[in-house]
């Protein structure tokens, strides 16, 4: 999987703040993988197998739910997490934004592939045509007898319960661990590095490297 964020920038920040980078990567992986694919057993009935649901925790007490059916909705979910990263930790904000958008775009493409496959499966089969003889007519008339369609079981409408107490306490504590401001030395080092880089909006930094991004911006 091609990464969108710069590995060199991540390495430079990891030299200054290695523990914080590792904590943030653990939190991002926990939010994307554990919260979506391995939900607690008591909340499994809340999820629908036909609609992949992405749960993103913006704070300890609020949960935002996004149905990741289109790539635009996936990017909108990424921008919501961007606001949280900007408030919490400005030091490695751009790195994790690009890392998260990369993961969400991969998820969006997977959802689109599943949606395309299900749409193709719903296509009706060829109709059954038989010849019926009509009086005072030399040529038989073609009559469509039946159109085979795949029967789909309709599930009863589920009442979605309120989005509260959906995670165990351990995950809430894990999300709240890196709520700390960066050290002055690390912040100065990060600001010096940012001044040397070309200015661009971090939400649209979807290139594979900073060199490719600067080439696109200049052209």
From Swiss-Prot:
It is found in: Membrane. GO terms for cellular component: membrane. It comes from the Eukaryota. The chain crosses the membrane at residues 81-101, 168-188. The keyword Transmembrane applies. It is a multi-pass membrane protein. Keywords: Membrane, Transmembrane, Transmembrane helix. This is Uncharacterized protein YJL118W.
């Amino acid at each position: 999987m091609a990464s969108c964020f710069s590995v060199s920038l991540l390495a430079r920040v990891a030299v200054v703040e290695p523990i914080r980078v590792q904590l943030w990567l653990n939190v991002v992986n926990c939010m994307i993988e554990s919260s979506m694919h391995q939900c607690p057993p008591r909340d499994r009935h809340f999820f629908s197998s036909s609609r992949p649901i992405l749960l993103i925790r913006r704070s300890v007490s609020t949960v935002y739910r996004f149905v990741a059916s289109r790539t635009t909705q996936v990017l909108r979910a990424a921008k919501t997490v961007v606001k949280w990263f900007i408030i919490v930790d400005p030091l490695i904000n751009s790195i994790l934004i690009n890392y998260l958008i990369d993961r969400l775009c991969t998820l969006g493409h997977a959802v689109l592939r599943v949606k395309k496959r299900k749409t193709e499966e719903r296509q009706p089969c060829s109709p059954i045509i038989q010849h019926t003889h009509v009086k005072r007519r030399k040529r038989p008339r073609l009559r469509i007898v039946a159109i085979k369609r795949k029967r789909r079981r309709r599930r009863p409408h589920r009442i979605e319960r309120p989005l509260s107490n959906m995670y165990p306490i351990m995950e809430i504590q894990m999300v709240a661990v890196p709520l700390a401001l960066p050290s002055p030395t690390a912040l100065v080092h990060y600001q010096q590095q940012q001044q040397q880089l070309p200015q661009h909006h971090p939400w649209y930094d979807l290139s594979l490297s900073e060199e490719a991004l600067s080439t696109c911006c200049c052209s």
